[in-house]
Amino acid sequence: MAAKPGSTKPSGKDSNKSKPLSSASKVSKKAAKRPPPKEVKSKARTEASQLKKKKKREYTEEELDLPKLNAITPVGVVKPKGKKKGKVFVDDQEGMATILAMVNAEKEGQIESKLQKARQLEEIREAKRKEAEARQAQKKNKLEETKAAIRQKRKRKGDSNEDTKTDTTATQPNGSSSKSKGKRKSVSFA
């Protein structure tokens, strides 16, 4: 492996080491032949298969387990149109009267129980109010007693002070009474 004249590059194995990418880029892989992608066309809405409505399965009442309401309309009773569903029709007046009596009795019982509860609550409120009033009266009495006791103490102290003052003023002359009020130290500056 002779080097080309005028070339400064090293020859042989050294050139491969310096350019590893150039040798790798020359190697080409065989591209796998793939068929071209097929276009999926959406069917028009007017096509017969889309226009045809599919039959939905209809369930029987037994399969659905629905409660039976107004299954039989009694003879002589005409259902008024436009009224709510779920009404119970009674074929005889006696049955209707018994049902009404039962419902009224229940309602009256509920009303009575409500009245009883209201009475009980009112009694409880009244008792609480009386207790609160009694507590307030006790507080007032206690306050009045303490006030009276304080007044009595003041009177006792005042009486004893007045007695002692009169005694001291009567026995001592006027000049010495000022000294007896309190021991004051006086400082005079010359």
Swiss-Prot record:
Residues 103-159 form a coiled coil. GO terms for biological process: intracellular mRNA localization; mRNA transport; ribosomal large subunit biogenesis. Residues 36-46, 127-148 have a biased composition (Basic and acidic residues). One of its GO terms (molecular function) is mRNA binding. Keywords: Coiled coil, mRNA transport, Nucleus, Ribosome biogenesis, Transport. The keyword Transport applies. One of its GO terms (cellular component) is nucleolus. Residues 1-67, 127-190 are annotated as: Disordered. Disulfide bonds: none annotated. Residues 180-190 have a biased composition (Basic residues). It is found in: Nucleus, Nucleolus. Component of the 66S pre-ribosomal particle. Belongs to the LOC1 family. Required for efficient assembly and nuclear export of the 60S ribosomal subunit. This is 60S ribosomal subunit assembly/export protein loc1. It comes from Aspergillus oryzae (strain ATCC 42149 / RIB 40) (Yellow koji mold).
